[in-house]
Amino acid sequence: EPLSAVEMGNRWRELQLEEEKEIERILGDLAAHVARLADELTWTVEALADLDLAMAKGRYANVLDATEPELIPFRGRPGSVAAGEAGYRLDLRQARHPLLDPARVVPIDVALTGEQYALVITGPNTGGKTVSLKTVGLMAAMAQAGLHLPVAEGSAIPVFEGIYADIGDEQSIEQSLSTFSSHLNNIVAILGRADDRSLVLLDELGAGTDPVEGSALARAILTHLLDRRCTTLVATH
């Protein structure tokens, strides 16, 4: 290798090392500068996230033609000063399922006074009972998230601590679960958690077994939920 080439190679390597050292210096200065502004930058990022969330909620409300509902606060626990009201007031007017085509969806009205805990939805198959349950559940979840609701003005919805639902057929061949047993597993879990600050949605309660036995089971489940003062909506089979 010619001596001139060796000298040029050494010089090229020196320049590489100087470049790497300069990059490290620049990055170090930048990191130190950012560190001095860490609190301000953190606050700015959080503020931008809050603003982005508020803008997204506003745009979504505009798409849904949504309104701001009245939020009903928690009931008082038994024995507390605010424990006089028997139940939550639920008043959804012209409520629309937010995921269905607005041009085709049929609005529903759902109302529970403060003296009621349960509402039974009955009607023919494909009549919209399950969609009604899902609509109420989504309204409750959206209210919890601080979203406006696709409902008419004057609607009111409670603030629930828990929303529990058993909707649809979850039979499992792998776990040897029939339609009835899968529903029963879900309901057992719900009964163990739901309390007077919960919304419980049950679809086709007691279905999948002998009608007489299913009716007795449904009655026992509803009685238990009523005793616990759970706000409950049930669709019949």
Q: Language-model segments: which ranges?
A:
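Switch/coupling subdomain of P-loop NTPase systems
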Residues: 2-39, 104-106, 115-117
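ATPase nucleotide-binding head domains, primarily ABC-like/P-loop NTPase cores
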Residues: 73-236
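Solvent-exposed alpha-helical segments within well-ordered globular domains of core cellular machineries
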Residues: 6, 10-17, 21, 28, ...
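Detector for methionine-enriched segments
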Residues: 8, 55, 139-142
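Residue-level signal for inorganic ion chemistry
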Residues: 1, 51, 203, 237
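Short intrinsically disordered, low-complexity coil segments enriched in acidic
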Residues: 1-7, 34, 42, 190, ...
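Charged, surface-exposed helical/loop "interaction arms" that form contiguous linear patches used
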Residues: 20-74
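Residue-level signal for secondary-structure boundary sites
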Residues: 6, 59, 98-100
